[in-house]
């Protein structure tokens, strides 16, 4: 008779385990500095039709997302500046999840699935924008 309660407990344990949601054990991808330096920073510096460059507003000290100022006469950041930009920008992403990363959702138009709280305008009309895809690739761990 004692075997019956143990069998019932074992069966219940199997049922509970089988019905429990499966948690992902996959680690978030690492953010690649070289991809950031080469591809992501280029997006920040690019002039987009009807928009100012991301860099123009985000080099100001009063922004929550602050990029380093370019050195006088420079058209790109030096190594030290790029490292600082990488650290700052990394704080705005959820590695492996572009759709929950502020870096991608705030400048994306609400009609394209973006956040309504970006005062700098809509840099990207949709997730099909090539520059949005560059940022998403970086967040997803793409390497050079």
Predicted features along the sequence, with ranges:
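Bacterial N-terminal signal peptides
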Residues: 9-18
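Aromatic- and Gly/Pro-enriched helix-to-coil junctions and flexible linker segments
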Residues: 19-144
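Bacterial N-terminal signal peptides that target proteins for export
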Residues: 1-10
């Amino acid at each position: 008779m004692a075997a019956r309660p143990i069998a019932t407990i074992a069966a219940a344990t199997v049922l509970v385990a089988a019905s429990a949601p499966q948690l992902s054990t996959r680690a978030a991808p690492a953010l690649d500095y070289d991809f950031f330096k080469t591809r992501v920073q280029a997006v920040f510096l690019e002039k987009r039709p009807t928009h100012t460059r991301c860099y123009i507003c985000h080099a100001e000290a009063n922004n929550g997302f602050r990029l380093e100022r370019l050195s006088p006469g420079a058209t790109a950041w030096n190594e030290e500046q790029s490292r600082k930009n990488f650290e700052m920008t990394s704080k705005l992403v959820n590695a492996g999840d572009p759709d929950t990363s502020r870096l991608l959702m705030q400048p994306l138009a609400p009609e394209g699935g973006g956040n309504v709280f970006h005062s700098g305008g809509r840099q990207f009309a949709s997730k099909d924008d090539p520059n949005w895809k560059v940022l998403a690739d970086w967040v997803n761990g793409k390497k050079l």
